[in-house]
Regions:
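FAD-dependent oxidoreductase catalytic-site/capping-region signature
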Residues: 1-132, 136-138, 146-157
């Protein structure tokens, strides 16, 4: 049996930055997983809860020994250390192209990339946070809305 503990609404935020003006150079990607203490606490609580589920009498007799992080990781610090060493992203990262009017925003409210005429970002990159459920439906909605904006702007031109 397997239980995977994950933070479906993480507070941690990473960055993607250009390393150079050369567009062929790969960007610097810093996901900063678990940089928010709240994410550590969510995963710590989830790990403790998962252990209680497996220790409950109906499951205990069917459960094998815990493999990760393992029964020796009993303190909060040991569990959090394991999360930092072995944790990974299980969902779809979003929000790599901030939308808004502030100077750090990549796209404006009509999904146009600032400073590059004719280029838009019409995908999950503009979501401010990851959705609790799969990102497919909201991505389709962004695509439909973006297509409508492109048609509107073409008619107005």
């Amino acid at each position: 049996m397997t239980i995977v503990v994950c933070a479906v609404r993480p507070d941690s935020r990473g960055t993607i930055m250009a390393r150079s003006v050369d567009p062929l150079q790969p960007p610097a990607i810093r996901p900063s997983y678990l940089s928010a203490a709240s994410d550590e606490q969510v995963l710590l609580s989830g790990t403790r809860h998962a252990r209680r589920i497996f220790e409950a009498p109906p499951l205990a007799r069917h459960s094998a020994a815990e493999t990760m992080p393992g029964s020796t990781a009993s303190s909060d610090d040991a569990i959090i250390d394991f999360m930092h060493r072995a944790g990974m992203n299980l969902h779809h990262p979003v929000g790599t192209c901030r939308m808004g009017e502030d100077p750090m925003a990549v796209v404006d409210s009509r999904l146009r990339v600032r400073g590059i005429a004719g280029l838009r970002v019409v995908d999950a990159s503009v979501m401010p946070t990851v959705t609790t459920g799969n990102t497919n439906a909201p991505s389709i909605m962004i695509g439909e809305k973006g297509a409508a904006m492109i048609r509107e702007d073409a008619r107005a031109a």
